[in-house]
Curated annotation (Swiss-Prot):
Taxonomic classification: Archaea, Methanobacteriati, Methanobacteriota, Thermococci, Thermococcales
Gene3D superfamilies on file: 3.30.70.240, Ribosome maturation protein SBDS, N-terminal domain, SBDS protein C-terminal domain, subdomain 1
GO biological process, one term: cytosolic ribosome assembly
InterPro entries, per the entry: EFG_III/V, Ribosome_mat_SBDS_CS, Ribosome_mat_SBDS_N_sf, Sdo1/SBDS, Sdo1/SBDS-like, SDO1/SBDS_C, SDO1/SBDS_central, Sdo1/SBDS_central_sf
Family of this protein: Belongs to the SDO1/SBDS family.
Segments passing through the bilayer: none
Disulphide-bonded residues: none
Organism this protein belongs to: Pyrococcus abyssi (strain GE5 / Orsay)
Protein name: Ribosome maturation protein SDO1 homolog
Length: 236
């Protein structure tokens, strides 16, 4: 169900001296600008393109055709979202910024380790480092796409090494059913085979920061009966 008009915010695009506005759900608009697949009908509070949303002054089909090459309001709305600015409230901007920072810090926590200990830094420590160096985070840009820039910035005060680990695992046959899908969530299976007794043997490549979590999950799934061996550590 589309957001109500009173809770929507304005997305605005100024082009060729003209202003075009739409009323949008701020959070779905953010997701759309990040590149996620969100139906435009769900983002819009109303299926109209305005010259001035506050006054209810709608853009004519002729105006839209002239500027955008189409009079379809949904297609025009997509262009406004991609190229224009979403007018967030101060609270919305603050909430989205904190959420985006935590997403980035969580990705770093999972993929990087402290080279001095081999263990990942806690998310809160990464967040403090981001704050200390004054990292600039883009609310409307995907978190994954910002990770490398953030790592470069915080490495000055927080030692980090991006690391992948390859682990050999053997899971007894009686636990394979429950473990098969869960294990694959951690990384990429590089090689697998089945032993004569039904055990599952495989090599899995996982981010360095989730190694302990991976072992804990394996132990829980197999009641401590899984066998593991670290085969390779690869710094990136």
């Amino acid at each position: 169900m589309p957001i109500s008009v009173d809770k929507a915010v304005i997305a605005r695009l100024k082009v060729h001296g003209e202003t075009f506005e739409i009323l949008v759900d701020p959070y779905l608009a953010r997701d759309f600008k990040e590149g996620k697949e969100v139906p435009i009908e769900e983002i819009l509070a109303t299926p109209y393109v305005f010259k001035d949303a506050h006054k209810g002054d709608k853009a004519s089909e002729k105006e839209m055709e002239k500027i955008f090459g189409t009079s379809d309001p949904y297609e025009v709305a997509k262009i406004i979202l991609r190229k224009g600015e979403v007018q967030l409230t101060a609270q919305q901007r603050r909430e989205m910024l904190e959420e985006k920072k935590r997403q980035i810090a969580t990705i770093i926590h999972r993929h990087a380790v402290d080279p001095r200990t081999g263990y990942p830094h806690p998310v809160d420590r990464i967040l403090r480092a981001m704050e200390e160096v004054g990292v600039r985070v883009d609310i409307f840009k995907d978190a994954e796409a910002q990770v490398q820039d953030v790592i470069k910035a915080i490495r000055r005060i927080l030692p980090l090494r991006i690391e992948m680990k390859v682990i050999a695992v053997k899971i007894p046959s009686e636990y394979v059913g429950r473990a098969y899908g869960e294990v694959r969530k951690f990384g990429r299976i590089k090689k697998e085979e089945w032993a004569s007794d039904g055990s599952w043997l495989f090599l899995i490549e996982i981010p360095g920061g989730v190694e302990e979590e991976f072992y804990e999950k394996l132990n829980a799934l197999t009641k401590g009966n899984a066998q593991t061996k670290l085969i390779e550590r690869k710094g990136l």
